[in-house]
Amino acid sequence: MRTAVVVGSLCMATDLGMALPFGHGLGSTVVAMRLADRLGVDQATTVQTYYGCLLFYAGCTADADVQADLFPDGLAEHWTAVMFASQRKSMAGVFRALGSGDGGRIVRTVRAAAKFPRAGRGYKHHTEALCEVAEMVATGVGLPRTVSGLFRLLTERWDGSGPLGRAAGADLPLAIRIVHVARDASFQCLLRGPAAAVEVVRGRAGGAFDPSVVDALSVDMVEGSTDWARAMAAEPEPHLMLGGAQIDDALTTFAAFADLADVIGHSSAVADLVGQAAKHLGRADDEVSVVRRAALVQDLGKVGVPFRIWHQDVAPSADDWEKIRLHPYYTERALSGSPYFAELARVASRHHERLDGSGYHRGLSGSELDLPARLLAAADAYCSTIEARPGRPALTGAVAAGKLRAAANAGTLDPDAVAAVLDAAGHRPERIVRPDGLTPREEQTLTLLAHGLATKQIGRALGVTAKTADHYVQQVYAKIGVSTRAAAAVYAVKHGLATDATREFPR
């Protein structure tokens, strides 16, 4: 399979996470490739530009819990248009986003002022997490180091005023400079049309943007296409390819990216369980692979739902539920560009459907739901029950089994699928080999860290002081080679260390 197919599908999901129109990232990439061609860049820079632009927002789910608290209505509406503007205008956009919500202008201003100091203190950390997660995602989907290494410089600016201060001017890779101009030009085109977009970008030359790249931009280049085929055709040759286990690794990265928005490790846990359940039913290897891979991508659409909904301690409102019910549709839509992912998208988008037609998002029933969809629905329901969620503790496996049997008796879940899932859940093998030399205690620390616990909470869970817990955390960071909790969570998912969500963690 072409790597571009995998990365392009993930790009569609990042459009969701940034509240952009579907296909915007594809169109931006077409613009970036036109710029690269006009500048006459070398082959290596062309490859970097293509994949760097597709995955520009790959870190958008980093620190989703913090984003949910600070920006309950999202950041994109107020910030994306000014992210490459002057520092003053960019911060003004952040301030407006902090104050978004109910109330008049005075209420919103007071709300923003109350949050602004905390947002300022956490800004550098969030930026580091964004870059680190994007780099890990790029690596996870099979891109070479020459591409994934770009993402640590994702937020830098030509004039050196980037928040991390890692590069400026000609030290900033040319591919990043091209991507920045292409992404902003494409977004400005959405707001005001091609000619005005080019004028806005020209006004940012010498600030965020390399003047020589801006000089190469013209109105005809900005009219990008959101067509999947055109974006795939823009991929530099020779095409990068993925096969076999590499595809599974890439889809596990999809799972980690999606789960950062809600419950860390959920999709991987469902994939492990439903794969075992399918084997228990004697399904062929290719059928097992399809349902397992579908589980890994089933919640990709969650990134299109405001993060506050997944992290609030109160029951969702009627309006919230309408948004929640859309996430399987978003999953299907994000995967719809590629014929290869068509079967995965079909199964994945049905994990909340029920036999009696009471599920969502299509309200399918009975014969409209095949065995893979029925297995996935049962496995997802089981894993959701044994995971701690905002507003409720994790329930035991016994309680989860009782709930699934009751659902089967009521005709909402398939009895055979429920039996297979429960059989698989009762015979899950323990993992013995520990990655990167982590001790059992460090594994525990990483699991707690991945589930969002602060240092004091980790200490309480492990029965140690906060100082000792912090020591464990730093040891974990050093061994796995990361520096932020979001990146640690991605690592935990990849190595199967985030799925132990069967207990209620101390808050």
Language-model regions, residue ranges each:
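Helix-turn-helix DNA-binding segment
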Residues: R431-Q474, K479, K494-H495, T499-D500, ...
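Base-recognition residues in the alpha-helical recognition helix of bacterial helix-turn-helix
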Residues: F56, Q298, H471-A478, V490
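Hydrophobic residues on short alpha-helical segments
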Residues: V179, L376, L446-A450, Y477, ...
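Histidine- and acidic-residue-rich, metal-dependent catalytic cores
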Residues: M1-G437, E443, T499
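Short, Lys/Arg-enriched C-terminal cap helix and immediately downstream tail that follows
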Residues: S336, A478-V493
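A ubiquitous, low-specificity "background" feature that marks scattered single residues
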Residues: A216, D272, A420, L448, ...
